[in-house]
Amino acid sequence: MSTLKLIPFSTSIDKQFSGRTSILGGKCCLQIDGPKTTKKQSKILVEKIRERISNGKVVEISASAYDTAWVAMVPSREMSGRPSFPECLDWIVENQNPDGSWGLNPFLVKDSLSCTLACLLALRKWGLPNHLLHKGIEFIESNISRAATDDENQVAPIGFNIIFPAMISYAKELDLTLTLPPSSLNALLRARDSEMIRREGKWEYVGEGLGDSCNWNQIIQKHQSRNGSLFNSPATTAAAAIHCRDHKCFDYLISVVNKCNGWAPTVYPMDIYARLCMIDTLQRLGIDCHFRVELDAIFDEIYRNWQEREEEIFSDVTCQALAFRLLRVKGYDVSSDGLEEFVEQEGFFNSVSMQHSNVGTVLELYRASQTRINEEENTLQKIHAWTKPFLTQQLLNKTIRHKPLQMQVEYDLKNFYGTVDRFQHRRTIDLYDAQASQILKTAYRCSAIHNEDFIRFSVQNFKICRAEYQKELDEINKWYAYFGMDLLSKGRNACEQAYVVTAGLIADVELSMARISFAQVILLITVFDDVFDRYGTREEALAVIHLIKEILTHYRWKAAPKECSQLVKTTFTALYDTVNETAAKAHALQGFCFKQQIISLWEELLECAVREKESLSGKNVSTLDEYLSFAPVTIGCELCVLTAVHFLGIQVSEEMLTSAEMLTLCWHGNVVCRLLNDLKTYSREREEKTVNSVSVQVGVSEEEAVAKVKEVLEYHRRKVVEMVYQSQGSNVPRECKELVWKTCKVAHCFYGYDGDEFSSPRDIVDDIKAMMFLGLPHLSTH
């Protein structure tokens, strides 16, 4: 009998990239073991975050010196000798950095060079103060060698190799003297030529770097959005306005400058994308549950945007993939047909503009492809077929220079379905940087994506939850020892294993009884597993089942007879008292008694365990179908879920719990967990001559048998996902359905790696330690 066995670990612990991807992530702003947080502090942060979410349409984004400079270069429609946007020139004059540069982050040298040269061009074009020019020129001349080197640690803005040489040429036209080493100029020109060849005509997004060589009227005809912009880029739109005086381009630029009070961001608008990123961030930090009402309102609005085919979503493949994934997982009816043009790698890179042809965008497509819910969704299957090997190759080639992005790609590729909530929350906390920049044609920050309040509250919330988890673990240990089950574990760290799994999937601090009851079921199943497999006899197993049948027959508990062995008394009494107490607490909350249903489930599980034990070498099981008719029950997914759902903070009914929908969902969950376990352990179980979904298949090779099991697993996993994600026509609360899927994700986590369940990879053990024991980072107060 193989149950949801867990990884033993020690509780004694010594004290590109390009595109919309964070480029300065990591732990640089974090310190370990900060002051003890309070619930009062958390409440203050909750209100601050709630206010920000409620004002979500006001997306705060940093000013772009680069884009502001290009807008400043646009001449007036009435008088070409004057700037159309003098307020942008004022902003440039007022925002030069002390070192003579312009730009958001001095560590991004290529970005600073690009921003600085663009600002110098604007100042020179309109004859503004020379002292600003001199300081800017000195900065460029001092740092130009760093722009001309292919330093893998130097992150370049999108199109830098095309735009920067073009701006140097434009500087000559304006008699702006730059004394640059010939070697640096030659290196920049070689990089430009290489980039032009590599991009194969996909240059429109960086059209300002091509100047008169562009057919601007054709670009406008092909790419102009309803808001008048080109690619929602003020810089590209400004270049178009300079070259062909398009009135819609001017109208867009006027709206941007008016909205931003005299400057331009590097992308506008980005309201929808920023709010999607905010939701994704709050979910990954584990604090979205505190803002359900506010986030649901945003989801409803974005779904309306999706139905109306809002241009901001569908003109941006990154935004579209992210919106699709978040909406589908939330339960909205969204079709994957809109992603059809990205089903092939070549077609993707030929169809998207430069700002989307990056690892970050491909990662979003890969994540979206994992939400496939039926066999007919060939679009998602085809996207998955190329995005996974593409991302894998990027890792092998070490072309992802941004470490946090590299780590995220590694984690998602390794075991996408095995993402345990609390593990992910802690991992995100460790990687999160509230001061991180993102980069397009220049670096920018958006407070809806990287926000200090988010990380502060996440850390405080994690500490509060962890304190509760430690208390609950103590309760579990006492309960386990009270019934003498610790004497049966034979050194297995059972309580810690079971509880970490439970807290990993039921994270909300208020759901204490749900965690405790779920963990108790895991532990009881594990004890009976040991009794049946290791310590007990067939007669003792049957004795326990007989006692349970007595309860079902007489509708009352009956203590184990004196003549029963101590093993029978210990296991039955633990089950007897625990089910009694859990049922009483559930009755008080829900108003009905579910005891008989749970007892029936225990009877079924133990009878199937006996049958599994008696099916050694598969002699009594002739087919895979026959094996699947009983073996999945012994994994315990259904029993764990139907016990814990009473304590999820929602009202449930007996009719719902016994409905065909709920029982079908639990059955699919049982099969997923069972087959994952089988795929992990079939080699060992073959040696032990234990029946398994692989070994039961006769007349085929082991490779064919494994392939068949994986095929069946994929079918049932897709069924679970479909039933969880689809809300239309469902009578089962989302919280109950998610508990089944999260249980499957735990099985994916612990069985989805190489090795067996008792020799898990180092990173899982590290996740466990980080979740329960290691010091949490904190931000210094100021």
UniProtKB/Swiss-Prot annotation:
Binding residues annotated for Mg(2+) 2, in chain numbering: D529, D533
Top EC category: lyase
Keywords on record: Lyase, Magnesium, Metal-binding
Pathway: Secondary metabolite biosynthesis; terpenoid biosynthesis
Pfam families, sorted: Terpene_synth, Terpene_synth_C
Binding site for Mg(2+) 1: D529, D533
Catalysed reaction, written as an equation: (+)-copalyl diphosphate = miltiradiene + diphosphate; (+)-copalyl diphosphate + H2O = nezukol + diphosphate
Motif (DDXXD motif): 529-533
Record remark: domains: The Asp-Asp-Xaa-Xaa-Asp/Glu (DDXXD/E) motif is important for the catalytic activity, presumably through binding to Mg(2+).
Protein name: Nezukol synthase KSL3
